[in-house]
């Protein structure tokens, strides 16, 4: 009888031990199937991360758009005036102004109304598509109507984008009170400091600021 009792106790203990282990396993499985503590904020964290990613993508797109944009926004800081050209049709520059086999490398015809107080004008043609490549740089301009081919070859070189491409060419007519020491920037070369060099026109040769009265702008594309 005692032997049977001992076997019964051992068997009961084994059953209890097995049940305890099973309960522990069930508890572990239930914990694994439930969200961990603090994960209630996970959807919000994902949302914030997605928002941040979206913002980053937007910033990249904005930067790319800014890089592609032919328009230098800082020009808006100045008063403006209208510039017209008979060398521009439907937003496209005529072949004659280009430095290609189908052009004559003649500077575009330009015309504008005189700006009050302006002693002279500076003319710049910029290709923002090619790191602000400067195609035209004339200073001490006193006329307000320039014929096609007015600029010399030392001041003007027409558009010559790579074959199969389209570039934008912007002409700025800057009305100044007085002459500047020099118009900065590489003619027929890249100008990574285009904005800084442009703003330098606001200081005259005597060091006086506020030299830029207004800026006229005309823009068009050319394809090769």
Give names to the regions the model predicted.
Residues 1-14:
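N-terminal secretory signal peptides that target proteins for export/translocation
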Residues 3-5, 20, 36:
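Ala/Thr-enriched low-complexity intrinsically disordered regions
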Residues 6, 28-31, 39:
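Intrinsically disordered, low-complexity segments
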Residues 19-30:
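Bacterial N-terminal signal peptides
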Residues 35-224:
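N-terminus-centered regions that define maturation/targeting leaders and the start
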């Amino acid at each position: 009888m005692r032997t049977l009792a001992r076997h019964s106790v051992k068997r009961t203990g084994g059953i209890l031990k097995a049940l305890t282990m099973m309960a522990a396993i069930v508890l572990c499985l239930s914990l694994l199937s439930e969200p961990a503590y603090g994960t209630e904020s996970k959807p919000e964290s994902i949302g914030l991360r997605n928002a941040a990613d979206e913002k980053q993508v937007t910033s990249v797109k904005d930067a790319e758009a800014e890089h592609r944009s032919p328009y230098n926004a800082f020009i808006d800081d100045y008063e403006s005036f209208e510039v017209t050209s008979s060398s521009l049709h439907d937003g496209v520059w005529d072949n004659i102004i280009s430095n290609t086999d189908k052009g004559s490398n003649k500077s575009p015809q330009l015309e504008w109304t005189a700006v009050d107080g302006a002693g002279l004008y500076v003319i710049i043609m910029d290709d923002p598509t090619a790191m602000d490549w400067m195609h035209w740089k004339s200073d001490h301009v006193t006329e307000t109507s320039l014929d096609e081919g007015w600029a010399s070859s030392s001041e003007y070189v027409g558009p010559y984008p790579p074959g199969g491409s389209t570039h934008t060419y912007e002409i700025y007519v800057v009305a100044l009170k007085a002459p500047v020491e020099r118009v900065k920037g590489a003619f027929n070369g890249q100008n990574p400091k285009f904005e800084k060099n442009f703003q330098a026109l606001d200081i005259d040769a005597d060091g006086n600021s506020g030299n830029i009265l207004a800026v006229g702008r005309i823009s068009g594309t050319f394809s090769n």
